[in-house]
Amino acid sequence: MMRKSLCCALLLGISCSALATPVSEKQLAEVVANTITPLMKAQSVPGMAVAVIYQGKPHYYTFGKADIAANKPVTPQTLFELGSISKTFTGVLGGDAIARGEISLDDAVTRYWPQLTGKQWQGIRMLDLATYTAGGLPLQVPDEVTDNASLLRFYQNWQPQWKPGTTRLYANASIGLFGALAVKPSGMPYEQAMTTRVLKPLKLDHTWINVPKAEEAHYAWGYRDGKAVRVSPGMLDAQAYGVKTNVQDMANWVMANMAPENVADASLKQGIALAQSRYWRIGSMYQGLGWEMLNWPVEANTVVEGSDSKVALAPLPVAEVNPPAPPVKASWVHKTGSTGGFGSYVAFIPEKQIGIVMLANTSYPNPARVEAAYHILEALQ
């Protein structure tokens, strides 16, 4: 009988992960090296730190240089700029504020910033800011916006191209403002709210918005056109692209997001679930708060094509998921992130409890990152 049911399982094709031989540490290291080494060569990446979460624990791999001039190697402690992966932290912090009853995604934006008196802001909700559907806020906050007065002027003068909740246009100016307003009821500045409500409870002790003096020795240089660069400060940078961290903290971040049931803090646990909830469908992709999800299984080319800037940064029509769907374990959950000198990628599949973090000190095309990550995770199944 036992043999018969085993045969049935094989015939039904449900045996893949249940009956797959576990990948050994040595095999995993080989898969990572055989994927990352040619990628770095092809994309001229000076240094990379990779974490693979497999069988309940992170495995770390480091390659190349954190600082070319000083000949400093990348280590698991090296700090990288996350770029837009910072948005996943903003999404979870916003989710935590919702869980505490401080804000609601259905609230009007003007409730948290009454000075926004422009007619165009009527009918724009916190949800629209958080998910890039306010009507066409720009990718970047303009450089001339340097203080709160010019920030207010910028948002007052902005005119939407589309009705709220109809079109997704990826924008730092959208989720950045969501993050800034979401913490207002807490009475804390953004950095303090992030530290006390998200970073500390998850023991992410080497994750920073502003890298302290004592940690500067670990901060990698980014490289752009052969020059060493780091991100410049800007309005709403903390919320949209300002987090710096190491591969160990990022692995812990992925594990917390992949298994929120293991998070002790009740509002944070709920905040993580809200960030991976599905608010809009855009083609085969679902928009969360910071996180983006596709139904698993998904073909590599679907994920790769969706990550291309031509698609990711294009205005696309949205279909509302109403009510929002709670997190789906059979999902490819991911986010890309770049600054002038850094390029990162994070992806995980909650159902399989596998995930990957790829941090690099140069910005290179998203499709190459996604392809490499997919290849490595595919080898674990």
Swiss-Prot record:
InterPro entries hit by this protein: Bact_CellWall_Synth/Modif, Beta-lactam-related, Beta-lactam/transpept-like, Beta-lactam_class-C_AS
Signal peptide: 1-20
Matches recorded under PROSITE patterns: BETA_LACTAMASE_C (PS00336)
Binding locations of substrate: K335, T336, G337
GO CC terms, sorted: outer membrane-bounded periplasmic space
Top EC group: hydrolase
Miscellaneous note of the record: The sequence shown is that of strain P99. The class C beta-lactamase family has a specific amino-acid numbering system known as SANC, for structural alignment-based numbering of class C beta-lactamases, or else the simpler name structural position. A multiple sequence alignment was used to derive a consensus sequence and then the consensus was numbered taking into account insertions and deletions. This allows use of identical numbers, e.g. for active site residues, despite differences in protein length.
Name of this chain's protein: Beta-lactamase
Organism of origin: Enterobacter cloacae
